[in-house]
Amino acid sequence: MMDERAAWLTQGKGATPDLRWSFSTEAPLSALDLARETGEILAADVSGGLYLLDRQGQFLHLNRGIKDVQLVHWSDRGKLGAAIYSNNNICCFDRDLNVLWAISFSVECLAISMDSYGDYIAVSLASGKTIIIDSQKRKIASIETIRPLSYLQFQVTEPRLIGAAENGLLCCYDLEGNCLWTEKHWSNCGGIATAGDGHRIYLAGFNYGILMFDHDGETAGTLVFEGTPKVIDCDFSANRIVAATIEQELYWLNQEGKLLWGGVIPDEAIEVACDPFGQWCVCGMKSGLVQCLDWSDAI
């Protein structure tokens, strides 16, 4: 008998994925992240619950002590995590979700990211500053941009931080705070995804589709499809892209933008994440339902 939670997958177009697992948070979902190496999922809900799941969707740890979490990041090796909470605070926590330290800022925090090893954390502020901190809470660098950065990602293979503003700006910095390149564009941005080696950078460009850039920030084209992408992710090699749209649809695409599968999501997507090999993705919905969709048998 089919799991009712998988029924929406069979109504899509293309190669139907298997539902590998489902998990529900106890309150509406507020944030989600995937560790590419361990396959672990970190999720937060609006009641203050912080959940760590293994790659099979099995519950590992729970912390209820961090209230009003807006964004989370879990290092690819599963060593440490970080979160923005209560608008202008960040914290760093260990594998058991025990808080190691916290910092309060005088302005709102917009984005947070952690490098693959859990050694560095970057946080962007509404003032236009982005701060790089190490795992021991020491400030490493301070960056100022012409617009506040709403999205941050560390590159895996090089010590680089890639950031994007809500509109008109994509940039790249080294870990000493030196600007490597800046690229202006003409679209609002709803999310960012990067290949592991940085050779491809994607921006969810809303009505403009998915904007593509290369390792040096040069425009590399646009992927246009039905719907208005708002959150996206890609695998390590950028061969697979997962995108959720404002119209409440989910798309699984190849690197050329060809639709491999698409369907209507039961609820608004808060975040999507793709495994490093492009075989499965995780979709976190506002209701608190988190599902892993698996195409490995279709490859």
Model-derived features: positions:
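Hydrophobic beta-strand positions that form the internal "hydrophobic ladder"
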Residues: 41, 80-81, 121, 161, ...
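A short beta-strand motif characteristic of beta-propeller blades
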Residues: 18-23, 58-63, 98-103, 138-144, ...
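A short helix->beta-strand "capping" segment at the edge of beta-propeller domains
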Residues: 2-28, 56
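Beta-strand-rich domains and repeat architectures in extracellular enzymes and scaffolds
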Residues: 21-48
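Residue-level detector of Asp-centered blade-edge/turn motifs that repeat once per structural unit
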Residues: 36-38, 76-77, 116-117, 156-158, ...
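WD40 beta-propeller blade core
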Residues: 51, 90-91, 131, 171-172, ...
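Hydrophobic core register within WD40 beta-propeller blades
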Residues: 32, 72, 112-114, 152, ...
